[in-house]
Curated annotation (Swiss-Prot):
Ligand binding (coenzyme M): 335, 446
GN (gene name): mrtA
Organism encoding this protein: Methanothermobacter thermautotrophicus (strain ATCC 29096 / DSM 1053 / JCM 10044 / NBRC 100330 / Delta H)
Keywords: Metal-binding, Methanogenesis, Methylation, Nickel, Transferase
Function summary: Component of the methyl-coenzyme M reductase (MCR) I that catalyzes the reductive cleavage of methyl-coenzyme M (CoM-S-CH3 or 2-(methylthio)ethanesulfonate) using coenzyme B (CoB or 7-mercaptoheptanoylthreonine phosphate) as reductant which results in the production of methane and the mixed heterodisulfide of CoB and CoM (CoM-S-S-CoB). This is the final step in methanogenesis.
Protein name: Methyl-coenzyme M reductase II subunit alpha
List of residues that carry 2-methylglutamine: 402
Length: 553
C-alpha cells in the first residue's frame, strides 16, 4: 500500500475495520441506519413533528431500501481535517452552501462613471473624493432599506439586514488614497503585487461600486430582483448626496445607468423554459465562478486553486442548480461531494500536476492534440488503477459517473496546467471520458456522457454557440444543460490554466475584485473550509429572522 496517496487517511478512518485494499467484505452487520447519529436525530425530530401535525406521516428511515447495509460513511472534506456525515453536505442542511449561493445572487457591480459624467456635464455639479464618500454613506443607509428622499416611507429593521452594504473600488491609486477606507476594496492590499498591477491595468481609472443586497431579499425574491433593488437605492442616494431634484430629466440617466448601462451581474438571464432571471446559478459562467472564488490571491498552487473552484462549483451547479432548480430531490449531493471529499480528486490532480511538471513544466508546452492525448491518458489510467487497487475507494465513489467526473477533472486540469489553455484542458476531459468508457464499457446513467461524445467537435470548431471559448460557457451552454457531474469540473478546468499562469483573474477583473471582500461571511478564499464549517454546524449565516418571530419558536 502506497502511504503517499492522499486519499488513504480518509479511507482508513471511514471504513475503520477494513483495510483500503481488502478484496472481501461484509453486509448487514453495521447497525443499519442507526449507525448514523444524524439519521437518529432525524428520526427523533420526525416523530415529534408527526405528532405536532396531527399524525400526518413524516420521515421514516425504515421505508424504502434498507439503509445501512454497508458502512454509512463519514466524509472528509478535502483539504481540511473535518469528517462530516453525508447528510450535512446537502445544501438544505448546510448553512454555508446556502450563504455562498446567496452571496452570489445578492451581488451586483455598478459603474459610477456614467453617473458622475451626468452630474458634471449635464448638471454642472462637481464630483470629488469628498462627494463620492458622502454618496457612499448615503447608499449604505439606503441599500439596506433606509429612506432618504421623502417622509412617511416605511423602513427595514437594520437587525434583519446587517449583511447589506455597498463598497467601492478603482484602478486609480490616487483616488483610492482619498476614499473612505471603511468602504474601499483596496486592490493593493487584497492582492499580491503582480496581480494587483494586472487588475489595475485592466480597470484603469474607472470606479465601481459593489452592492450586496440583503440576503433575506434574495431568499424571499430571486437574483433578478438584485439589480432593481440596487438601482432604486442608487438613484435615491445620488439625489440625496448631490442635492438633486427628484423629478428632473437627468434622473432618468441615473436610472438607466444603474439598471442597465453600467450594471455587471453575476449571471445572465435564462431562457423561458428554465424561467430564471439574472443572478441565478444557471446563468453563472464557469469563468465567472472561477473569479468569484478567491483562492488564487492567497495561494500560488495551481492544483489547490483549481480544487477550491471545483468544490464551490459542485455546491452551486450540481447541488443547487441541477439538483434542485432543475431536478429536485436529494440524490445530486452524492455526485457533487465526490469532487470535494476524501482527498480523492486532490490525489488525482496532484499526480497529474507532478507528471506535467516533470515532463513538460507548468505552462511548458503548446496545446497540441499529442499533448492532450499524452497527459489525459496518463492521468486517466492512473485514476482507474486506484479504483481497481483499493475497493474501498470504489465503494466511496460507488457511482460510475462519480468516478468518470473525478478522473476526467484531473485529466482536464492537468492538461490545462501544461498548456495554460482551457480548450486543451476541456479536450483532456473529453478524451478521459472516452478512454474510461472504453475501459469500463459504460460510465454513469444513460446519457451521462452525451456531451462528452460530441465535446471535441464543438470545442475545436468556430461556431456561434458550440464554439464558445471555455471560460464563457456555463450551465446554459448547449449540451451542458442537465448532465450532473460535469459543470463543477468544467469550472475547475476554466480556472486551471489561469492558476498555472499566475493570472490575477480568469474572465472578469471586476468580479475578481468584488469578491475580495473580508466582510462576506462565506470565505471565498477557501470554499471547502466554509462548507466543512457548515456541515459541522459552525457556520453563522446571514438573513436570519429571529427579530420578527416569537421567542422560542
Amino acid at each position: 500500500m502506497d502511504e503517499k496517496k492522499l486519499f488513504l487517511t480518509a479511507l482508513k478512518k471511514k471504513f475503520e475495520v477494513e483495510d483500503p485494499d481488502e478484496k472481501y467484505t461484509n453486509f448487514y452487520c453495521f447497525g443499519g441506519w442507526e449507525q448514523s447519529a444524524r439519521k437518529k436525530e432525524f428520526t427523533e425530530y420526525a416523530k415529534k413533528a408527526a405528532e405536532k401535525r396531527g399524525g400526518i406521516p413524516f420521515y421514516n428511515p425504515d421505508i424504502g431500501v434498507p439503509l445501512g447495509q454497508r458502512k454509512l460513511m463519514a466524509y472528509r472534506v478535502s483539504g481540511t481535517d473535518a469528517y462530516v456525515e453525508g447528510d450535512d453536505l446537502h445544501f438544505v442542511n448546510n448553512a454555508a452552501i446556502q450563504q455562498m449561493v446567496d452571496d452570489i445572487k445578492r451581488t451586483v457591480i455598478v459603474g459610477m462613471d456614467t453617473a458622475h459624467a451626468v452630474l458634471e456635464k449635464r448638471l454642472g455639479v462637481e464630483v470629488t473624493p469628498e462627494t463620492i464618500n458622502e454618496y457612499m454613506e448615503a447608499i449604505n443607509h439606503a441599500l439596506p432599506g433606509g429612506a432618504v428622499v421623502q417622509e412617511h416611507m416605511v423602513e427595514v429593521h437594520p437587525g434583519l439586514v446587517e449583511d447589506c452594504y455597498a463598497k467601492i473600488f478603482t484602478g486609480d491609486d490616487n483616488l483610492a488614497d482619498e476614499l473612505d477606507k471603511r468602504i474601499l476594496i483596496d486592490i493593493n492590499k487584497e492582492f499580491p503585487e503582480e496581480q494587483a498591477e494586472q487588475l489595475k491595468s485592466y480597470i484603469g481609472n474607472r470606479t465601481y461600486q459593489v452592492n450586496r443586497v440583503p440576503t433575506i431579499v434574495v431568499r424571499t425574491c430571486d437574483g433578478g430582483t438584485v439589480s432593481r433593488w440596487s438601482a432604486m437605492q442608487i438613484g435615491m442616494s445620488f439625489i440625496s448626496a448631490y442635492k438633486l431634484c427628484a423629478g428632473e430629466a437627468a434622473i432618468a440617466d441615473f436610472s438607466y445607468a444603474a439598471k442597465h448601462a453600467d450594471v455587471i451581474e453575476m449571471g445572465t438571464i435564462m431562457p423561458a423554459r428554465r424561467a430564471r432571471g439574472p443572478n441565478e446559478p444557471g446563468g453563472v459562467a464557469f469563468g465567472t465562478f472561477a473569479d468569484i472564488v478567491q483562492a488564487s490571491r492567497v495561494s500560488d498552487d495551481p492544483a489547490k486553486i483549481s480544487l477550491e473552484v471545483i468544490a464551490g462549483a459542485a455546491a452551486l451547479y450540481d447541488q443547487v442548480w441541477l439538483g434542485s432548480y432543475m431536478s429536485g430531490g436529494v440524490g445530486f449531493t452524492q455526485y457533487a461531494t465526490a469532487a470535494y471529499t476524501d482527498d480523492i480528486l486532490d490525489d488525482f490532480v496532484y499526480y497529474g500536476m507532478e507528471y506535467v511538471d516533470d515532463k513538460y513544466g507548468i505552462c511548458g508546452t503548446k496545446p497540441t492534440m499529442d499533448v492532450v492525448r499524452d497527459i489525459s491518458t496518463e492521468v486517466t489510467l492512473y485514476s482507474l488503477e486506484q479504483y481497481e487497487e483499493y475497493p474501498t475507494l470504489l465503494e466511496d465513489h460507488f457511482g460510475g459517473s462519480q468516478r468518470a467526473a473525478v478522473a476526467a477533472a484531473a485529466a482536464g486540469c492537468s492538461t490545462a496546467f501544461a498548456t495554460g489553455n482551457s480548450n486543451a484542458g476541456i479536450n483532456g476531459w473529453y478524451l478521459s471520458q472516452i478512454l474510461h468508457k472504453e475501459a469500463h464499457s459504460r460510465l454513469g446513467f444513460y446519457g451521462y456522457d452525451l456531451q462528452d461524445q460530441c465535446g471535441a467537435s464543438n470545442s475545436l470548431s468556430i461556431r456561434s454557440d458550440e464554439g464558445l471559448i471555455h471560460e464563457l460557457r456555463g450551465p446554459n451552454y448547449p449540451n451542458y444543460a442537465m448532465n450532473v457531474g460535469h459543470q463543477p469540473e468544467y469550472a475547475g478546468i476554466a480556472q486551471a490554466p489561469h492558476a498555472a499562469r499566475g493570472d490575477a483573474f480568469c474572465t472578469n477583473p471586476l468580479i475578481k475584485v468584488a469578491f475580495a471582500d473580508k466582510d462576506l461571511s462565506f470565505d471565498f478564499t477557501s470554499p471547502r473550509k466554509s462548507i466543512a464549517a457548515g456541515a459541522l454546524r459552525e457556520f453563522m449565516p446571514e438573513g436570519e429572522r429571529d427579530l420578527i418571530i416569537p421567542a422560542g419558536k
